[in-house]
Amino acid sequence: LAGLSAANYLHRKGVSVILYEAGNKIAGLAQSFHDTDGFTYDFGAHFITNRLAKKVGIEDKCRTVKHYAETVWLGGKSYSHPFGLMRVPRMTMSGFAAKFKGLTSKNKTETAADWFRAAYGEALADEVAIPLTEAWSGAKAADLSPAVGDGISNGIGRTLLLKMASRLTRRAVSCGYSRELPEKPSVYHVYPMGGIGTLCQKLAEGLDDVIKLESPVEKILVENGKAVGVRVNGKIQEASAVISTAPVNVLGKIVEGTDKLEHLTRFRYRPMIFVNLRLKGRGLLPDVVTWTPESEFPFFRLTETTLSMPWLAPEGKTVITVDIGCEKGDEFWQMDDEALGEMCVENLKAIIPDVRSRYLGCRVLKTPIAYPVFLREYEAERRALMEGTGVENLYSIGRNGEFSHIFMEDVHYRAEQKMKQHLNHLETIENIFTSSAPSTKNHLIAGLFDKDSNTAGKDKNIAVEVE
């Protein structure tokens, strides 16, 4: 999304754009898949905000999401999130104690575990927040930066306001999905007809003639501390700037001519497995999202998408997406689709007793790069990355490129802002191109290039982007 957002913005500003994509299709994981039985699967985000839809120009092609809520499954019971947990006495008392302690002492939070206990109290932190964090990150909370907590909560008052607005308007008001722009009752979730890929298709409009698929970027070239171009399919394209959306640990490997970014190769992303279960019936989970922090479950999150978007499955049927944290090559990663489906069904019996009789099959996605992991060991370097790459004319944008937990609206907004800043700093602009990184099929590279050049021109005014 970041690559297309950047290319689209530059194209609208009169800069010619060519898109080089390493894979055989654009949009990466921001795609929808439809099977012959009438089920739709979205890998990545399931919905966007109406504000983003209007901004991109697909507002009239979206359906309003009327309901969204989360629950936590704990001790065989379901608790609404966040307010249901507040009615558990031990969690309420522990939470008050933590707040009082915070007012009377100034203990520094050095780890994610410290942050959760200070924010929620020991009971909720130890039973819910910390186990969930460790499940999706694959790291101990004591080894994670307290920055994990950044942006998790809008605050009780703000959350209550947005939840009340959602009930009154009968729309899924955005709560915790936007950081760059304010969340308010008028900002709610919508689903593009045809799937989330509709957003990417709209951003790609007008770029058809310049999109080049199966064109991986092999190297980003740096000379005298400046990004000066890229090598694509063995050919060099000179550049005045490079805007990368590649995972930062990939960026650190493909930069040639400086060792300033070698430390980025230590940054970790959490691999994930998403198992989409097809089931008979609907309303099988307590609500749209059910978090499962207890160690008895091999998964940490369940999402029954049809409770928000009933059109994603045939009438009388549903899809439940099961999120499993893993590592490449581990037991889960090596399981085939049938085995993963069976494992999920077996472990869902505690929540859906008759799930076996409802099971119709599954579809599975495995991705080696799902979420950035904020380890303390490279926290200083991560914070430095927030200020820039340290290489002149080399920018890193997007969820993976910024190594940040941001959602689609923020990805789009931040990509455009970076492009705006870039154009403001260029005295002369003649062209742009976009292309893809070598390590994964989902990464893009974008840049400015001569309007009349073909694959490997010598134009100096070029910005490059990798997603």
Q: Can you name each region flagged by the protein language model?
A:
Residues 100-219, 245:
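Active-site/ligand-binding neighborhood in enzyme catalytic cores
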Residues 52-66, 71-81, 120, 124-126, ...:
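Feature captures the FAD/FMN-dependent oxidoreductase FAD-binding
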Residues 13, 215-321, 325-334, 338, ...:
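Mid-domain catalytic core of redox enzymes
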Residues 310-315, 367-396:
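FAD-binding beta-loop-beta segment adjacent to the flavin cofactor pocket
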Residues 398-422:
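A conserved FAD-binding loop/helix module that cradles the flavin
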